[in-house]
């Protein structure tokens, strides 16, 4: 992948999302559309953003019984996304069925532990061990289920890459060295994540909320 940056288009207005994508398309490798975008704009919105000409990452984080998730995967097949997310916490059978229902050219990756969660959150959720430990466990399960890869923070990607040499690793929650953390609790810089083995770097607010999004995207690209 020549440019691993996927811009998170988490904007409420479709026209604004398309305009931003057009502005920065020369400095990113793909576009990530999350649950908020998909619920607001549906298939039509995805088709409109796809006209920009970059790969589409549908970050829907599907999590339900195996049959329901498989049905959802079949429903979005027509959109031809490059990447789709499901939750590893849905279990092995759910992950296997999701992969079987996905399009031939769609990578199915499992979310391990959200980057907004830390060790204290693991404890309150009744999960034994740290966020790092849980991410490793769920990554192993995703590999056993035959998925293409996982979503994890930059803190875990290096260790998981060593256990899964040919895995596809998506790392969100990235912030430039001078950036604000916001609601991210386990953030690293884009360069650190890339050096640790990340395949895709998901970056949203540091670009989308910058005074000059093109300059921000170019600056991050230059660090890689």
Swiss-Prot record:
GO CC terms, sorted: cytosol
GO biological process, one term: 'de novo' pyrimidine nucleobase biosynthetic process
Keyword annotations of the record: Decarboxylase, Lyase, Pyrimidine biosynthesis
Record's catalysed reaction(s): orotidine 5'-phosphate + H(+) = UMP + CO2
Active site as annotated: 61 (proton donor)
Gene Ontology terms, MF aspect: orotidine-5'-phosphate decarboxylase activity
Claim: Lyase is one of the keywords in the record: yes
Keyword Lyase: yes
First-level EC class: lyase
Family per similarity comment: Belongs to the OMP decarboxylase family. Type 1 subfamily.
Self-association and partners: Homodimer.
Protein name in UniProt: Orotidine 5'-phosphate decarboxylase
Species this protein is from: Novosphingobium aromaticivorans (strain ATCC 700278 / DSM 12444 / CCUG 56034 / CIP 105152 / NBRC 16084 / F199)
